Every structure is written in C-alpha cells, then in structure tokens.
Amino acid sequence: HAMNPVRLQIRSMLTLQPSPTGFRALLKVDPGFMLFPDHFPGRPVLPGICLVQAVLLAGEAWLVGTALRLGTLKSAKFLGIVQPGDEVVIEGIATHHDDGSVRIKADLSSRGKRIAQISLTAGQAVAITGAPA
C-alpha cells in the first residue's frame, strides 16, 4: 500500500541511531515540512500527531521488516513545542505481544529538555496486493 506524503516526509527526516537498550532515533525537522504553512501561519509548530508518527516509524525501523499501523494512542503528553530546524531525540522500547500487536513507549527531547512522552499500540500493516475482486 502507498505511504501518505506526510508519513514519507517524516520518515525522510528520521535517522535510527545505536542504543544499548531499545531504540534511539533522531528527527531533524525540515524547515520546509509540508504542514508548517498551515500550522501555524507565521509561527510554525510541528503538529503533535507528527511526533506520534515519528515514534511509530522509529519503532518500525528498529523492528526491521515490520510495517506498522497505529492502533491505539495509549497516552501522549506534550511538554514543549517543536519548531522548524529543531532536532528531536526519540528514545523508546518496542515489544511484541501474543495478540500480534506491538507496544511502543518513547521519551522525546529537544535542546536538552523532554518535550513529549508517547505510549501507543500498533498492529502490523497489511500490504494490499492486486486489484479487488
């Protein structure tokens, strides 16, 4: 299935880094990010859902070969804003569960301060192949 343009751009800004436990990723926020003109005009701020998507993509990259889709957003605490050009460090853990779901918990920081804590459940994405019958 095709990835939406926002998810593709978030993925392009994300780099997985070595971590002794769990996963660590760096999100380098592109000043040209497609949602900035509307969120908010004159004072761009990265929408919180984009941080949720970055956590999902970082967990997906760490699990290698597992395409994930957001299931349930268990909790999201946003403690700061992310602006164009910021770098966000995402540190988290992803665990597989017997029901096939993946649980991801992550702390996000920027400029040395925690900016968000996100906990979510994801399911494996189903690839759509062929035309409908």
Regions found by a protein language model. Name each.
Residues 1-9, 82-86:
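Short, solvent-exposed secondary-structure boundary motifs
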Residues 4-46:
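Catalytic strand-loop segment that frames the active site of acyl-thioester-processing enzymes
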Residues 8-10, 70, 88, 114:
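Residues that act as N-cap/strand-start positions at coil-to-secondary-structure junctions
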Residues 26-28, 77, 121:
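Generic structural detector for well-ordered beta-strands
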Residues 56-94, 101, 123:
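Hydrophobic beta-strand-centered segment that forms part of the acyl-chain substrate-binding groove
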